[in-house]
């Protein structure tokens, strides 16, 4: 369809049937042949179809051809012998390409004006020097030349000029002035730039120097925008949603295990918890439905700290028993007033209160099977009872004492009720570990840098 607003050929449903001449010459060889005047076998297919101008039957000719250094196209030409109406257009015979294409041609000579151009329906044509643009889908596709594109634009602008001159003389005068500029381009009054931008990737501008490089032509391939994909009738690909990172802080994980008491199948719950003003820890709790045994354990969620930690709390008030406490597996506990020390790994890791830990210590000591029964040492039993009583007094707030947590790994914690201010009754010390402490933590022989060089076995 031309720029003058000509009507396109009849719809496929309006076709009557192929002419006898077309039926008598069956196609041989490739379906799409290179466009050549010397190829006698390359004959168009003729179809009788409805003229949309006079509504009588005209003839549509279809030519399946291949543009050199480009791709296959279908050239369609319609003519009506009754009213004289004719129209020519092209359609791409291939699929929409993966990328859009933009041709930028600097026209300097008549040779450039004669370059072959394939312009599809979806292509936008621009001449920046004149601030002129032919929008996409405003014209049907065409197989023409650069000069033909300009002539087509001139015809479209001249179409309604007589009416404009009678109704809007000022606008018609400005359009006449612009038409004059387009005609000057045809006469090569000055060089200009022609830009053909096709999101479908199926437009083409000839390179007369092919396969050598064309210095006057710049070809740019680009990814279509969602708006361009929608314009072409393609389903715009939704942007890939970033997979949400699994937030374990708000989820309790469960896995099967065996009860440490009766060895029956049990379930262990595990949850990641953020301790305020400290770090993340992993709390695991096991509940056996068979024997009723319950246990919980805390694992550090981080690495071994560069320095060890010693926390000293002076217990002066019963409210101290409510302080949250994290005791890691590597933490030892001391109560100097009771001459008591609980070694590393005893009771395992725990996240509880100070009262809860002291009760666990009392239960651990008083229920020791070697201190009970007839065979127990009376002096030892008496000392344990005295220890239990004094520990009970500390729990009840009747006895002041110092509670010391010493963790070489630096992964234990005791709540500061005055946070973020300093606690006057609590002292936190950071210290450098000794060789023996590093040995217990397995750090002395650990190589964290340059370990790749020592992987090969030495012989």
UniProtKB/Swiss-Prot annotation:
Q: Name one GO biological process term.
A: negative regulation of motor neuron apoptotic process
Induction data: Up-regulated by high fat diet.
Q: Which Pfam families match?
A: jr-ZPR1, Zn_ribbon_ZPR1
Zn-finger (C4-type) intervals are 51-83, 259-291
Alphabetized SMART domains for the sequence:
Zpr1
Respond yes or no to whether keyword Protease is given for this record.
no
List the biased-composition ranges (Low complexity). Answer: 9-30
Look up the record and name the associated disease.
May contribute to the severity of spinal muscular atrophy by increasing spinal motor neurons degeneration.
Please state what the protein is called: Zinc finger protein ZPR1
Taxonomic lineage: Eukaryota, Metazoa, Chordata, Craniata, Vertebrata
